[in-house]
UniProtKB/Swiss-Prot annotation:
Subcellular location: Cell outer membrane
High-level lineage: Bacteria, Pseudomonadati, Pseudomonadota, Betaproteobacteria, Neisseriales
InterPro entries: OMP/PagP_b-brl, Porin_opacity
UniProt record similarity statement: Belongs to the opacity porin family.
Identification of the protein by name: Opacity protein opA59
Keyword list, A-Z: Cell outer membrane, Membrane, Signal, Transmembrane, Transmembrane beta strand
Name of the coding gene: opaD
Function per UniProt: Implicated in a number of adherence functions. OPA proteins are implicated in pathogenesis and are subject to phase variation.
Organism expressing this protein natively: Neisseria gonorrhoeae
Length: 243
């Protein structure tokens, strides 16, 4: 609100720094959902990342209370994983007139995954109360409800290679391998759109009766994508203009 406590519509533009927390909950071994298999990858177990994004709002100032609708898009989080597992399948010693040698047969399994988790968009509605301090500085608090869209995608490929390593008694070892056996790629894509709830707080600094500098914080719980929870903490700096 301005110095004259005027009322009227306003627009606001912010640049927000978002701390994003993704938590993956696994069923207890003895729980009722112990046999439920989640299709959400283990990628998203306790991920902490961040992004910077713009946010725009339109609202109405009632001279103390404000109501505003806001919209924001977030950066996509992605990661690659590569793992190798080597398992011994067979071991034997061979002895003949020419000497002895050891054969070891192993299976090498290579697994590669590409995963993304994206808070694609958030459309929110906030109710905010500005505290009149008798100065240009006006702290505020409020509540927010938002319709958010979250996407998750994983693509994985796996191949196996069988190798036989021979260790002669008096010579260098040698390795014989077959052609890699590739399994069919696995791809999964999930999305959810749901209502989430959060809180907002901050301080407005009146530059002119119609222009306010806004430094704010907001917390938002986006809800669940199966058993994956997604939350954001955001710090923002912006300007608000009341008509």
């Amino acid at each position: 609100a301005g110095e004259d406590h005027g009322r009227g519509p306003y627009v606001q533009a912010d640049l927000a720094y978002a701390y994003e927390h993704i938590t993956h909950d696994y069923p207890e071994p003895t729980g009722t959902k112990k046999d439920k298999i989640s299709t959400v990858s283990d990628y998203f177990r306790n991920i902490r990342t961040h992004s910077i994004h713009p946010r725009v709002s339109v609202g109405y100032d009632f001279g103390g209370w404000r109501i505003a609708a806001d919209y924001a898009r977030y950066r996509k989080w992605n990661n690659n994983k590569y793992s190798v597992n080597i398992k011994e399948l067979l071991r034997n010693d061979n002895a003949n007139s020419g000497g002895s040698h050891l054969n070891i047969k192993t299976r090498k399994t290579e697994h590669r995954e590409n995963g993304t988790f994206h808070a694609a968009s958030s459309l929110g509605l906030s109710a905010v109360y500005d505290f009149d301090t008798g100065s240009r500085f006006k702290p505020y608090i409020g509540m927010r409800v938002a319709y958010g869209h979250v996407r998750h995608q994983v693509r994985s490929v796996q191949q196996e290679t069988i190798a036989v390593t021979t260790y002669p008694q008096n010579a260098a070892s040698s390795v014989t391998t077959n052609a890699p056996i590739r399994k069919l790629p696995h791809h999964e894509s999930r999305s959810i759109s749901s209502l989430g709830f959060g809180a907002v707080a901050g301080v407005g600094i009146d530059i002119t009766p119609n222009l306010t500098l806004d430094a704010g914080y907001r917390y938002h719980n986006w809800g669940r994508l199966e058993n994956t929870r997604f939350k954001t903490h955001e710090a923002s700096l912006g300007v608000r203009y009341r008509f």
